[in-house]
Regions:
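Short beta-strand->loop structural element characteristic of the AMP-binding/adenylate-forming
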Residues: 1-12, 40-43, 90-98
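Conserved pre-ATP/AMP-binding loop-to-beta segment of ANL
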Residues: 11-31, 64-65
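Conserved AMP-binding A3 loop
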Residues: 27-54, 61-63
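AMP-binding/adenylate-forming
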Residues: 44-51, 67-120
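AMP-binding/adenylate-forming catalytic core of the ANL superfamily
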Residues: 209-294
Length: 317
């Protein structure tokens, strides 16, 4: 059920469309974000949606009539699944129009945000998250700076690992206590020939999925090093942009990403791409991080990054 809609008819229409699809279709459709390729439509059976919703509820210990909050786009899997969980599990859902910094004006048992939303909330209203008992993060890695700030809030914060193809999260990590992801019920992880993660989910009866994520396994879990298609080899050394970005996020406040350019000596040289202009950033700002040969050799400034509809930065080589 919907407890209230804070943003008018657009979110009410979105919920009504999802509810109609649930009541009238044998399968439920989800659109990928397009951050790693051409957007596509993926379908799941109602039984798979129900089992996914129940697994989430079990993990977070959420009962019928739980008060939950969402400010995610309804067109993609994270937002759509919040609405479907509310339908299946009889939650009271407050659904706010997507924004960079959602407004929390009540108390909630559970909420789902992107890492970018939480970072902006911490900057604008550091105590707002205290009104929520449990928070699920997704939509991209959490910066080290944001993770440190989250240790000061009372909320239980979890980062989910998953994608549209897995019907949202298949692994979780407690941001305050764990450095690695642990599989949810029925999920098994193995490593492919290229060091990439392979997912098997007997709980949802999904076929084995070979991802492009490069992972490092440890007891009971794994860490994500980066994506296979983003790896940079510079001077014969392999670098993962995502891992470097987590370190750099300690000191770089504006949006950025790591890329590479051809180099006669190194093959590829690492470059830092920053949103803004030359007045906003100087390379010496990161000297104390001791990045060694992984330090960017050049900074490229772009007035505005291209982003997906869900807010993810589109990397451009």
């Amino acid at each position: 059920m919907i407890n209230k809609i804070l943003s008018g008819s657009d979110m009410q229409d979105a919920y009504s469309a999802i509810e109609s699809e649930w009541n009238n279709s044998e399968v439920i459709s989800f659109q990928t974000s397009g951050s790693t390729g051409v957007p596509e439509i993926i379908t799941f059976t109602k039984e798979q949606v129900i089992r996914s919703a129940k697994r989430t509820a079990d993990f977070f210990d959420l009962k019928e009539n739980a008060e939950v909050f969402c400010a995610l786009p309804p067109v993609y899997v994270a937002g759509k699944m919040m609405a479907l969980r509310a339908i299946v599990l009889h939650w009271n859902l407050t659904w706010q129009s997507p924004s960079g910094s959602p407004i929390i004006d009540s108390t909630y048992d559970f909420a789902a945000f992107t890492s970018q939303q939480v970072s902006q909330m911490l900057a604008s209203s550091p105590t707002a998250l205290n009104a929520i008992q449990k928070v699920l993060l997704g939509g991209g890695p959490l910066s080290e700076r944001a993770a440190a700030l989250l240790r000061n809030v009372s909320t239980n914060i979890f980062e989910g690992y998953g994608m549209t193809e897995t019907l949202t999260h298949v692994a979780m990590r407690n941001v305050k206590e764990q450095l690695f992801f642990r599989p949810l019920k029925g999920v098994q992880f193995t490593q492919g020939e290229k060091g990439n993660l392979v997912i098997e989910d007997s709980w949802l009866n999904l076929p084995a999925l070979e991802t492009n994520d490069i992972v490092e396994f440890m007891k009971d879990g794994f860490t994500v090093m980066g994506r296979l298609d983003n790896v940079i080899i510079s001077g014969g050394v392999k670098f993962f942009p995502e891992e470097m970005e987590r370190r750099l996020s300690q000191v770089i406040l504006q949006p950025f990403y790591i890329s590479s350019m051809p180099d006669e000596v190194l093959g590829q040289k690492i470059v830092l791409v920053v949103e803004g202009d030359t007045q906003d950033f100087q390379l010496k700002k990161i000297d104390h991080l001791n990045l060694g040969i992984g330090k960017p050799r050049e900074v490229i400034f772009k007035p505005k990054f291209n982003r997906t509809d869900s807010g993810k930065i589109i990397r451009e080589s």
